[in-house]
């Protein structure tokens, strides 16, 4: 039986790295994405050494749709049938009140937390539909249900992640 392939965005640290470790521990092949090539390479070395699983790196900024599409297209044939997509890349910057916040910072948060999730889903899910199987895990946050002072934009993006996840199931 062929090992399943998991594609994880934001895999160079934190929750994404933790997911990579858990899936490697359980015998999955991994496609890891992140912006920091050195950190990704270190994660790859650790996982291959500790768990002896195949790891493919796709370093790019998920906000860059062209880079995402080019990375997806660059995958060797043996890595094309992605079974699980984990949209984990995300960030929070700025904790200003809405009437004081930076539109540029908000663009970065929205582009990373919402639009990149849509773009990655659009790049990967058609193959899942074609094969009749696959799973998408979108990392949300309790902040999507409960706003906190200065966090309204981040909280709104996490509420959007929840709504998009619900919509994807339909």
Where are the language model's segments positioned?
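The beta1-alpha1 cofactor-binding region of Rossmann-like NAD(H)/NADP(H)-dependent oxidoreductases
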Residues: 37-38, 59-70, 103
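Residue(s) in the substrate-gating loop at a strand-loop-helix junction
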Residues: 141
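Conserved glycine-rich cofactor-binding loop
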Residues: 12-14
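Conserved glycine-rich Rossmann-like NAD(P)H-binding loop of the short-chain dehydrogenase/reductase
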Residues: 28-42
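Active-site helix of classical SDR
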Residues: 121, 157
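Active-site loop immediately N-terminal to the catalytic Tyr-X3-Lys motif
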Residues: 99, 148-152
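Substrate-binding pocket helix/loop in short-chain dehydrogenase/reductase
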Residues: 96-98, 102-110
């Amino acid at each position: 039986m062929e090992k399943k392939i998991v594609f994880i965005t934001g895999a160079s640290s934190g929750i994404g790295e933790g997911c990579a470790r858990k899936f490697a521990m359980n015998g999955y092949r991994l496609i890891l994405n992140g912006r920091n090539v050195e950190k990704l390479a270190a994660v790859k070395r650790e996982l291959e050494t500790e768990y002896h699983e195949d790891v493919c790196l796709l370093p790019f900024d998920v906000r860059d749709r062209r880079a995402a599409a080019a990375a997806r297209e660059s995958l060797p044939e043996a890595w094309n049938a992605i079974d699980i997509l984990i949209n984990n890349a995300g960030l929070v910057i700025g904790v200003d009140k809405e009437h004081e916040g930076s539109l540029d910072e908000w663009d970065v948060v929205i582009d990373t937390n919402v639009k990149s999730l849509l773009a990655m889903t659009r790049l990967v899910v058609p193959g899942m539909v074609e094969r009749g199987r696959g799973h998408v895990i979108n990392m949300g946050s309790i902040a999507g249900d409960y706003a906190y002072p200065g966090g309204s934009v981040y909280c709104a993006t996490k509420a959007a992640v929840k709504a998009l996840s619900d919509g994807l199931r339909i």
